[in-house]
Amino acid sequence: MSNQHSPQPFCLDTKLVKLLEELQEGKQFNNKNIFPEKALYLKLALDYSFFRKNLLEFCVHLDKIKGVIRPNYDTIYILCLLEVDLLNLVFTDNILEICLPRFVSREDLRVFNNTFYTYHDNRLRILQEDFSQLFKKIKTKASVLCFTVEEIFLTNQEILPQNSTVAELQKSTNKVQTNGPQRHDFIVTLEIKLNKTQITFLIGAKGTRIESLREKSGASIKIIPISDKMTAHERNHPESVQQTILISGDLYSIALAVTSIESALITLDL
């Protein structure tokens, strides 16, 4: 007798199944169940056709799924707990694509060195791996690969119910420049101005300090060149020259970048 458990649709909420079946582009499903307060969530990217084909099997695992997002016609994102049977279902085609909550260094991914994988734009795509070994590796690196509840809000605003903390975060977005139309990954750009002396320090020798800031925060940090040629007075007094820095990313990475910059400048009394 087979050990596999077949999905039992008669035990499922048919309205819920229909809602997921008819999920439109740009829409999302939010699970109203209560999840553990300190839970970590994987954000998995799937082909919509695969999700639709295996819909009943996914519905069997709804108690492990916090949200389902359909950003476009071809793609579904699933925010779920780190649960072996659900991940095994997703890994049916021997491909697992994980959307990461923040920048991850190659050092953090060393556990996958014996695995065929690609890492680009905060997406980890794993292919042709033994599932049991893969699951162990993911559990080992859960703190790097998974979202906290707070990070889920930063990248998927409507997955969580509204509360005072969320409202404060939403107010803060009015103070930054949005990066084009509203996006599901909630990327924003913050513009700050520093003087030339501070900028020179932040860049560091051969750009090493600014690269370290980018790597640690996960934010994109761009220094806008000064458009006008500096006068002799300005060259002798660089602290009088203002220069712009653009910091792009989610609120978490931007806050981390700004805090790191402020800390570095305060330490040297700049």
UniProtKB/Swiss-Prot annotation:
InterPro entries: KH_dom, KH_dom_type_1, KH_dom_type_1_sf. Residues 191-225 form the KH domain. Signal peptide: none annotated. GO terms for cellular component: nucleus. It comes from the Eukaryota. It holds the Pfam family KH_1. The keyword RNA-binding applies. GO terms for molecular function: mRNA binding; U1 snRNP binding. Gene3D superfamilies: K Homology domain, type 1. One of its GO terms (biological process) is positive regulation of mRNA splicing, via spliceosome. Keywords: Meiosis, RNA-binding. Induction: Its expression is meiotically induced and required the IME1 protein. Required for chromosome pairing and genetic recombination. MER1 may function to bring the axial elements of the synaptonemal complex corresponding to homologous chromosomes together by initiating recombination. MER1 might be responsible for regulating the MER2 gene and/or gene product. This is Meiotic recombination 1 protein. It comes from Saccharomyces cerevisiae (strain ATCC 204508 / S288c).
